[in-house]
């Protein structure tokens, strides 16, 4: 804070949201923000009434109670929530096809899974992994208005395949080279059951047991692959990285920063894909990346409420094709998790 500053004012979309009388050079000022894009103006005022302002935006707000900045980090597999597990198993068994489910409260570690280690066609879900590797390589977020910023926006918000291929080429000189880079990054995070497999085809109780990761069925296919367990761990790592914690920060020290995580979370908050975890909107703020092909439909993301944060991953496959029942399953799993939070 500049010398001589006596007061700080914060305006959100032009509305005065907070003021602070300055008595020391360093201080914290907490300002709740809505779950939508806003512009923040921070003004410093000296004893003569002169103003100096900084404008920041757009900024997308998340509940303070869900922030990953402090407190113990639950074990990776946490513990199985018996009530939630019964619901998740029931939903998994009733789905007309094969599905893989994983859900976890990121504050308590309680969660449930169904067929979470079965490999599914990954479709567009691994585009988040492309984005993580790109920001690790760039050592920072791309400049607003730049080609890379536009490609990232189109890839994560609109799930554009051409943009994903161009970013793979940026990473490795070709889609296969970029794919190898993404695979290497995922292996470093321990995500051993996922495979980028080149670029995208362009078409128009008192005792707590760990969350179980058994395989009850898996589709037969060749190509990009992932599991509910791998995707959930990637989303969890992104959440923790926003608070300068977790595997992305520790494993890639200095190369992947909290600002990178928050940038990707901002893009995920603006995903235009329909269905799936979107059915939980109204009960939670949803940051997610969906993926689909004719026989597979998936959604994986982070759900934020005033009380906490959750990771929810739902992968579905049916040899005869998938549709609204996959979206309905994702919504039901998400709402079941929120009810237990």
PLM features: residue spans?
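Short, conserved catalytic-motif segment at the N-terminal edge
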Residues: 92-119
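Structured C-terminal helix/loop/strand segments within mature extracytoplasmic catalytic/sensor domains
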Residues: 2-3, 12, 29-47, 54-67, ...
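Second-shell loop/turn segments in exported
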Residues: 70-78, 113-121, 140-142, 150-154, ...
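Active-site-proximal loop and beta-strand segments within enzyme catalytic domains
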Residues: 136-162, 176, 180, 188
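Mid-domain, small-residue-enriched loop/turn segments at the edges of structured enzyme/sensor domains
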Residues: 168-247
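Active-site SXXK
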Residues: 109, 119-143, 155, 312
């Amino acid at each position: 804070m500049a010398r001589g500053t006596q007061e700080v004012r914060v305006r959100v979309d032009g509305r005065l949201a907070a003021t602070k009388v300055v008595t020391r050079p360093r201080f914290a000022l907490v300002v709740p923000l809505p779950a939508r894009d806003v512009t923040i103006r921070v003004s410093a005022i000296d004893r003569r009434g002169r103003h100096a302002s900084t404008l920041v935006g757009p900024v997308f707000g998340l509940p303070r109670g869900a922030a990953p900045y402090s407190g113990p980090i639950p074990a990776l597999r946490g513990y199985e929530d018996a009530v939630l597990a019964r619901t998740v198993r029931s939903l998994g068994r009733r789905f007309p096809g094969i599905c893989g489910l994983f859900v976890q409260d990121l504050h308590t570690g309680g969660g449930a899974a169904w067929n979470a280690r079965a490999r599914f066609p990954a479709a567009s879900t691994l585009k988040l992994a492309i984005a993580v590797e790109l920001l690790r390589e760039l050592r920072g977020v791309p400049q607003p208005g730049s080609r890379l910023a536009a490609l990232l926006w189109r890839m994560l918000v609109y799930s554009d395949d051409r943009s994903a291929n161009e970013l793979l080429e940026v990473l490795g000189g070709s889609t296969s080279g970029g794919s190898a880079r993404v695979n290497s990054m995922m292996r470093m995070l321990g995500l051993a059951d996922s495979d980028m497999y080149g670029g995208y085809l362009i078409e128009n109780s008192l005792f707590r047991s760990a969350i179980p990761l058994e395989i009850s069925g898996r589709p037969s296919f060749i190509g990009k692959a992932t599991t509910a367990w791998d995707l959930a761990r990637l989303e969890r790592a992104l959440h923790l990285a926003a608070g300068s914690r977790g595997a992305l920060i520790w494993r890639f020290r200095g190369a992947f920063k909290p600002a990178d995580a928050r940038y990707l979370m901002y893009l995920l908050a603006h995903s235009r894909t329909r269905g799936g975890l979107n059915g939980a909107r109204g009960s939670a703020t949803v940051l997610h990346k969906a993926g689909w092909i004719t026989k597979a439909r998936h959604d994986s993301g982070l759900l934020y409420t005033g009380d906490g944060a959750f990771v929810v991953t739902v992968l579905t496959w049916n040899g005869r094709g998938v549709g609204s029942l996959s979206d309905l399953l994702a919504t039901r799993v998400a709402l079941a998790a929120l009810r237990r939070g």
